Structure formats: C-alpha cells, structure tokens
C-alpha cells in the first residue's frame, strides 16, 4: 500500500510526464510563427520567447485556472470555470489545442485516478456540456490526488515548458543539451508564475485578470493558422 503523500506525488509524475500521450508534441503554441519570421534561431532567442510566454501567458491563464479550481466550493463552479478558461483563449488553435490535450488528459486520468469530480467532468465532456480545457482538467485531477496547490501550479507550468522545449529542440533545431539548459533556466520563471498567480489569488482578483495575455503572443498564435508550411498544429 502506497502512502497517501507518495501516491499523490507518483500520480503527479505520471500525469505531467512529457511522454503522456496528450498530443503536446504537436504544438508550438505560437513559437513556430516566430521561427518562420527567423526570430527564433538559437538558445537565446527561444529562451527569451519562452520566458515571455510563461510570464505573460501561462501565468495569467493556466496557472490562475488551476488555482481557481482549487478554490471551487462545488463542481458547478468547475463547470463555469471550464467554459470561462476555454473562452478566454482567443486564438482558435490555442483554444482547440487546450481542449484536445485536456480531453486526452482527462481520459487517462479518469482511468488511473477516478474520483467524483473526475467522473462528473468526464461525463460532462462526453455529453458535450463541458469543453475539457487542460488547465481545469489538471486542477481537478491534482486536487483529487491531494497535491498541494503551489505544487499543482508549478508542475503544470513546468510540464508545458518541458514540452515546448522538446518541440523546439527538433523544430528550430536546438541540441539536446541546449534544451536541458533551457529547462533548467526555466525553473526561475516557473517559480515566478507560482508566486504571481498566488498573489493574484490571495488578492481576490484571479478571475478578473484571467486571460490578460500580451497581444503580441496572441497575434502570433492567430497568424500561425495562415502559415503556408507548418511543423506544428499550433
């Protein structure tokens, strides 16, 4: 019998592993647009983009969404958040990618770590009442695993960082060792995302600022839809 605290950690490690088949390997979340413009060509330029993406997008979208799920008093609140978090993703590819990866995560999580909220979430998705955004799905799964809130936020943001860096390694391309150096450096940015989202949550304005993303990032993500040649789905 695995101790509860260890069980939660092991569940977290499984569900945030880059090998989890959610389809994250096929998304650049906008950095391919900068590649096409020859603005991402090496470690320095990709690191600058990734830091901005964490600070200006993930912090104010996914990180806050996870915290809002943790603060939810009932599942009806989660249903509202699922709709809200999906709607705030303005670029179509980002919105669709978030729900596609979220549904896959939910399917895997429901089989491995069933729970009341997980079951209701999956039922809502199957009935097309809920979207299944990845951030809210992860919030429900992490909460069910009794993962501490800050840890849930950090692991979700860091998983996105690792996935994007792995995609940049083969897309730009970067060397494998270079990719690992970027991932190590990104720990500081992940820490900022945790701290900033915690502060916004404690100030009671998490929902108010949810989706406050830098326009340049969203424009690049929208422009990706019209690129003539693409390696990634977003």
Curated annotation (Swiss-Prot):
Required for maturation of urease via the functional incorporation of the urease nickel metallocenter. HAMAP family: UreF. The gene is ureF. It comes from the Bacteria. Belongs to the UreF family. This is Urease accessory protein UreF. GO terms for cellular component: cytoplasm. It comes from Kocuria rhizophila (strain ATCC 9341 / DSM 348 / NBRC 103217 / DC2201). Its main location: cytoplasm. It is found in: Cytoplasm. Keywords: Chaperone, Cytoplasm, Nickel insertion.
């Amino acid at each position: 019998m695995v101790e509860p605290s260890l069980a939660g950690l092991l569940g977290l490690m499984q569900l945030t592993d880059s090998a989890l088949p959610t389809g994250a390997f096929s998304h650049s979340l906008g950095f391919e647009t900068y590649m096409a413009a020859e603005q991402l060509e090496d470690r320095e330029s990709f690191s600058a983009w990734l830091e901005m993406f964490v600070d200006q997008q993930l912090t104010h979208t996914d990180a806050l969404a996870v915290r809002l799920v943790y603060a939810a008093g009932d599942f009806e609140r989660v249903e509202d958040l699922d709709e809200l978090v999906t709607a705030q993703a303005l670029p179509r590819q980002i919105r669709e990618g978030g729900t596609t990866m979220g549904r896959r995560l939910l399917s895997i999580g429901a089989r491995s770590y069933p729970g009341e909220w997980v079951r209701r979430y999956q039922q809502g998705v199957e009935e097309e009442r809920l979207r299944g955004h990845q951030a809210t799905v992860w919030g429900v799964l992490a909460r069910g695993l009794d993962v501490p809130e800050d840890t849930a936020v950090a692991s979700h943001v860091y998983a996105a960082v690792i996935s994007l860096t792995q995609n940049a390694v083969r897309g730009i391309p970067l060397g494998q060792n270079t990719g690992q150096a970027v991932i190590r450096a990104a720990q500081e940015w992940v820490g900022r995302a945790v701290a900033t989202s915690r502060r916004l949550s404690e100030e009671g304005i998490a929902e108010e600022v949810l989706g406050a993303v830098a326009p340049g990032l969203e424009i690049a993500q929208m422009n990706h839809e019209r690129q003539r040649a693409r390696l990634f789905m977003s």
